[in-house]
Amino acid sequence: MVTVDGNRLILLTDGPDRLEAITNLIGTAKTSVRLMYYIFAGDWSGRKVRDALLAAVERGVTVSLLIDDFGSSGNPDNFFASLRAAGATVCRFHPSWGRRYLLRNHQKLLLVDGESADGSVLIGGFNIEDDYFKAADDGGWRDVGLIVAGPAAGRLLPYYDALMAWSLKKGARIRELRALIQRYSETSGALQWQFGGPMRRVSPWALSTTRDLNQGCDVEVIAAYFAPPWSMLKRIARVGTEGRARVITAAKSDNTATILAARFTYNQLMKRGVEIYEYQRTKLHTKLLVFDDEVHIGSSNFDIRSLYLNLEMMLRVDDAEFTSLMRLYFEGELDDSLQITREAWDKRRTFLNRLRWGLSFFLVTAVDYTVTRRLNFGGE
């Protein structure tokens, strides 16, 4: 545990611990529980969380749940019928057809008692589904969760409530969504909540990331889905030339296209001295950026969709002790990763592989991962 600006930060690296934290937080809620997840499955873990929410409602706690309709499309609406009947608010984020159809609410949070100064929030990249709560050695997704206990948690309450109101409103306008993303993103302090979405220009979270990367000389990235725009790749390459840059991507996933898309970027980065690693132990789902003394942690992948389109929530932490903790975590992940050497990579850069990588990069930057997951791109 690290204390930052009066808030306790607790890192959760194991799947079973994250599920236990969720049920414990819901079980100890006194006034309110607010949840927001991209995927809320109807499996054992989903039922366990739903039943904990139902118990909270029955003891007088106000409960609201916002899930992405596309991400949770496999879970029928009647799964939440008991929650609604008990008085909870359950909303599916479902923008209308047209250009808004591509918009996904990719944020993940559990906010408990946000009205009080000692509220808590659990953030990270994981969803409510069995695979996110299994141990890594049992085939679970490798991810991180972070509990923030203290006044910073409550600062998320108005953002959540505004987004819920927008999602429930018929005919809600995109410009209203852009306004609330801008309004509630923070630009000062040791802990800053920053949000991303379909802005006309660059979102607050993407702008903050760009600034920190521009100034960075020691960069560490763990990105399960790594397909950033060329402007970001050039910035990472610059750090590789002038300082030190290390990137861990996935070697295993339920979506081969995302692995191949990341490999499309390797050549340019390695030519500039960036060290590339692929995580071997299990499927990787972590989203972590460390730029010198700043850490960005939350829901956002390091790709074009997350940077410029999806609704995302990240916490920027400017604290030397917490940064040291996350650098130690990064070093531990290197132990379960394989470095991609220049010599080995040159042997794999066949014409067919480069074609697969390029096609995959195009598709994952233009199409939702849930769609590309159904495509078969083969290995390498």
Predicted regions located by residue number:
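Charged, low-complexity intrinsically disordered terminal segments
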Residues: 1-380
